[in-house]
Each structure stands twice: as C-alpha cells, then as structure tokens.
Amino acid sequence: MLYKGNKLKVIDLQGEQVSDMVLFNATDKREKISSGKTMDFENTILITKGHHLWSNRSIKMMEILEDTNGRNDFLLAPCSPETFQILYKNPEYHPSCFENLYTNLSQFGIEPDEIPTAFNIFMNVQFAPDGELSVDPPQSKAGDYVLFEAKMDLIVGLTACSAEQSNNYSFKPIQYEIIT
C-alpha cells in the first residue's frame, strides 16, 4: 500500500534494469493506471519528471517528481509467457513480469485479466518514423531513480523485468523506498 502523499522511489541499483509498475486505487480496484489516458492528458508518449500517471477514470494517481534517467515506456504491455513465444520465438517456458504482477497482486483480489499496461520504468523503447518499435538497452546507470508521489491511496505492483531484450541481456534487482 502507498498512501496519498507518500512517495515511492524506484532505484536501478546496477544500471540497465527495467521495472514494470502497475497501480490500482486501494478503495476501488476497478480504477487502475491507464497508458491511454496518461498519454492523452500529458500530450506525450515520453512520460518523465513533471508528468502525472492517470487512471482509467481520468484521475491523477501519481506525479513524477524526479527522474534522473528520463527514459520510460508506456507503450508495451508487461512481458508474459506469450511474449517470449510469439515475439521472441522462444518455445520454452520463461518467467515474466505479467506472472510476477498477477501472482503477487492476487492477495488484493486482483485477477490476471485486470493487469493493465505497465509503466515501464527505465525501459528504452524507440520508434521509427514508420511507427515500428524497437526495444533498446536501457540508458539508466547505477543509482538512477524515479521519485513518484501518490495522489490517492494505491495498491502498487512493481517487478524487475525478466525480458532479456529489455535489460541488455542481464537481470539485476530493482530497489524501492517508500517515503512517508
């Protein structure tokens, strides 16, 4: 739980590690983070310091107070077993952000189908003039962080991304701090 006015600091301890984050209103879990509303109301796909993360009900959920890296993604869904099968042509089982999120959020009554598009902290998604997307290595360095302030009481799901392509083919921990 993150209460209104609390701050959440997400830290890339070693550099080049993405963290997927989803948000739910703590009093009504049907209200959740929305990539579409956020990009609409912030008028950009490059969400960083000074921007807000908006809900599917057009209400501010968080504000980004600081962002030492400045590159995050809100276009791509959390990686799932299907991501590895379809996109990366990996027929073997692979752990995923989607599974990490729904498994750990189930204690709050959140089902897999309720997991929204995550705010992908430190993820470096590039887009060509023709619209083609590519996932490049994160630009984050050891110690980079994003500081958020909760605008309502929130259930926060946070995971270190397990997709090789998103993390320059290495997996590292993500640290977080809650500041009251």
Residue ranges: model-predicted function:
Residues 1-180:
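Acidic, Ser/Thr/Pro
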